Amino acid sequence: MIIRPVVRSLQGRAPLATLRSAQSVFQPLPQLRRNASVTTGPDAASKASTTPIARITTTTEAPKDQKKAKAAAAAAAEPEEQEVIMSRMPRSLEALYLQPLRREAEYGVPSCDLQLRSYSIRNLEFFCDFALRAAYYLGLPAFGPVPLPRMIERWTVPKSHFIFKKSQENFERVTLRRLIQIKDGHPETVQLWLAFLQKHAYYGIGMKANVWEFSKLGVSKAMDESKSEVEKLLETRWEHLSHVSDMKGVGNFEDFLAKERLRISGGR
């Protein structure tokens, strides 16, 4: 409907009224007002053009400042509730996530050196942590674990036999080591600690312990006195060294062999 008067005007047939109405459609829109007015009343339209933008921004940002002030006042009023964090786990379970506790050595005299070896770093660190916790609960001052130099072993072997014997392959094995030292420990407590680690040994872990015991002067006399006690204990053990306990002398040995031959052959 709008295109037809425009085409007629181009041909000189359309009246002027239609031209004016068509031109009024394409007139530009009035300029929009960019400043908003906050006041209300009959003079609002006159003041709207003079209202600055900065004044509007301050009025809109005022609630944000009030919220920040309220949050700061609430944080200042209750500082202790935010700092204190209560754990719901038992202490025995929470201790697994913390470093193992340690005892302090009074004199610093070494009593045991425990060396742990493994091919897996994960198993080694786990068992070192277990050994340190066990030493703490036994009252032993433990130090470590100290990383020792690695032991690297390599082998070159034929890959196969027959026609493939010229092709070779290399193998490498790395042994990781850690050292835990016990100071100022009682010999019986150290033996109890080592026995506990042997009882609850972890797979893939090798242990080697060097234990020092301090005794009084005149150790040879104490060893001579204990010799007689050891002999009495061994008298009952010597009987178990032979598989036949009732064999008394050499004279009955021939009779014993004859009876065994008859028994094995079935009386033939």
Curated annotation (Swiss-Prot):
Identify a single GO molecular function assigned to this protein. Answer: structural constituent of ribosome
**Protein name as annotated:** Small ribosomal subunit protein uS10m
In the UniProt record, the transit peptide is located at 1-64
> What domain of life does the UniProt record list for this protein's source?
Eukaryota
Q: Which UniProt keywords apply?
A: Mitochondrion, Ribonucleoprotein, Ribosomal protein, Transit peptide
Q: Which InterPro entries match?
A: Ribosomal_uS10, Ribosomal_uS10_dom, Ribosomal_uS10_dom_sf
Question: Could you describe the subunit structure of this protein?
Answer: Component of the mitochondrial small ribosomal subunit (mt-SSU). Mature N.crassa 74S mitochondrial ribosomes consist of a small (37S) and a large (54S) subunit. The 37S small subunit contains a 16S ribosomal RNA (16S mt-rRNA) and 32 different proteins. The 54S large subunit contains a 23S rRNA (23S mt-rRNA) and 42 different proteins.
Instruction: Look up and give the organism this protein is from.
Output: Neurospora crassa (strain ATCC 24698 / 74-OR23-1A / CBS 708.71 / DSM 1257 / FGSC 987)
Q: What biological processes does GO assign it?
A: translation
Q: Which SMART domains match?
A: Ribosomal_S10
Q: Which family does it belong to?
A: Belongs to the universal ribosomal protein uS10 family.
In UniProt terms, what function does this protein have? Component of the mitochondrial ribosome (mitoribosome), a dedicated translation machinery responsible for the synthesis of mitochondrial genome-encoded proteins, including at least some of the essential transmembrane subunits of the mitochondrial respiratory chain. The mitoribosomes are attached to the mitochondrial inner membrane and translation products are cotranslationally integrated into the membrane.
Q: Cellular component GO terms, alphabetically?
A: mitochondrion; small ribosomal subunit
Instruction: Give the location in the cell.
Output: Mitochondrion
